[in-house]
Amino acid sequence: ERDKGNFTWDDVDQYVVYAQEHNQTILATIWPHADWEQKSCKRKKARSAFGKRFTKYLSKPCSMDDYKNFLLKLVDRYDGDGSNDMPGLTKPIKYWDVMNEPEFKMFFKGSKEDFIEIFNFSSKVIKEKQPDAVIVMAGAAGMFPESKKYWKVVLPKIKDNFDIANIHHISGPDGQCDKQLWVDEFAALLKSADVDKPIWLTEAMT
């Protein structure tokens, strides 16, 4: 949404078409940041890890109503319900990953409470629009001490609003990989938060 109410789907459509042609299933990551919207309440610019093609802002939406409108338009285009779908859609998007590694400031400039609000809000909006949607937890960036500390606080407050837990295998400063891809420690953290859900590893550094 480059401007309020002006939705441009070309880039996303290309990914969806490619996935359909190659029989791939999409896990779509939702970023709740639009430049025009963040400017409206004078959010501070941020340096993105993804360069110039990505948003210059990484804060909580200024207006959750505007964000909800974006979410509804997004899901409506790719849910495969036959209404307002992308032309030629044959393989709907069912799996939605709400945000990415929010404990890293290069991906999210907000508090734990901000993330919790955005995540729970997004999940409920998506499920209302697409009842069979599967919500994937924003990927945890490994199980380093700071990540564990972050998710220990956050997990109990979002656990009712996701279907699949999500861990990313991030190597340490020494470049060494965790032999269990962090899944063992992540499973223990989930158990401590009374979360009993499937675990997906959606990023891996080797």
Regions found by a protein language model. Name each.
Residues 1-162, 166-172, 195:
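Substrate-binding cleft and catalytic face of glycoside hydrolase catalytic domains
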Residues 164, 170-206:
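Catalytic-core region of carbohydrate-active enzymes that cleave or remodel glycosidic bonds
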